[in-house]
Amino acid sequence: YRLKYNKIINQVSERPFESDKGNDFVLKIFENSISKEKHYALVKNIKSLNESYPVRMHKLNIEKDIFAEKNIFGDEINHSFDVIEKHGSGAIVLINNDIAPNILKAFDQRQKKNNKLELREYGVGAQILKNIGIKKIILLSNSNKKIIALDGFDIEITEQQKI
């Protein structure tokens, strides 16, 4: 209820972002006003509320994303950059689970941790999407799970694309 009706995610900064995987992105940094966690969105060419954009909702995983540890999930971030570059627009929303201060503990518990987004995190991601002006998404995901939590935020999944 609070995630739907109370705005708890606020943009705190933004800057241009370019990498080997894509140019002309803007890195937007958001803060959860309750937990103080920082979340990130890499955004490219979002101009119309009526257009569907490719979006990757990604829960940050220190072992996989930073240290490139081998796992069964593949390279979703790099593939998402490729899809967005080909489309010419889109966003990668990076949901932080405040894991950075506890890197060693995260390594020890990686078998127990679920790397899927939880319902609470979809609410955070939905608030970020609304802030950057996205109402219709082409969800970039290898999961077949139907995400219904976004409906309450007036965000529509128009298509799902495997990455």
Describe the role of every protein-language-model region.
Residues Y1-I163:
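Catalytic domains of riboflavin
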